[in-house]
Amino acid sequence: MLLGGCLYGFAGGGLPPSIKTVAVLPFDNQTPEPTLTQEVSVAVREAVQSRLGLREASENQADAVVRGTISRYEPDLPVAYQGNTENNQVTVSRRLVQITVSVEILDQRRGKALWSRSGLLLEGDYSPGQERDGRQKALDKLVTNIVEGAQSQW
């Protein structure tokens, strides 16, 4: 028996037929971490293009816009500890990044929100010294939330 692979993607993924292009606006960043704006915008832009099948367009030309606010960034929350009985010391073995965002996808032609979430808490755990890994996990969760939310709402 020969088994074949199957590739699939979401070409529009449940979007209204009129939504073919999107502009991802830079997210407002209310945190002290300046690089978050670009990291979030790039991750969201790539996701709406590759996973929702939309083409990028300028804000004036786009059928829809994605906009949002990054309201909180906690990069160094200890979540797991390891004890050493020889010297009675406890060390942190896992840490957590938390990012809180609000996101909206707006149909520009109709002037109405297609999907929105406020206060979305995203987390990513990491080993000490590997904060970037935790941040990437949190960004991956943001992208998944936006894509799944958008597909389920339309």
Give residue spans per PLM region:
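A structural "domain/chain start" motif
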Residues: 4-49, 53, 58-61, 106-109, ...
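Surface-exposed short loop/turn segments
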Residues: 10, 50-114, 123-135, 144
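Conserved acidic
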Residues: 32, 36, 40, 93, ...
